[in-house]
């Protein structure tokens, strides 16, 4: 589904859904607990925000941690099989894209309005020029084989001193 199609669907889903919520887990928490646990945490946070609690939870993917006493089912490629999962995917993606476009205003050199934070060749190149910022996940290797770029020259001194 294209970005334009998702943008058309988003207000329809938000208007017509019985209940919906989107939750975010910041990059520091992702670095601390890992991306899978952070995704499950975000799902739980979104479930906490629903006006009406679900009777059954459908999850896109193969992992989920039980939420309260509500039964759940994990469905691989669930967004292609269930309208509710597809709608949740549209909301999650459009809200994340909106967040990344907002970050782009502060960090235009990463071109987050275009790459949405994905490690494109251009994004990786900009990291080699500007380093990473607080909005990058430190646990995600953006520059394989080259290591992470250093933000400050002092980091190079500390790094080289620690290997002596």
Question: Can you describe what each PLM-predicted range is?
Answer:
Residues 1-164:
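RNase H-like, Mg2+-dependent phosphodiesterase core
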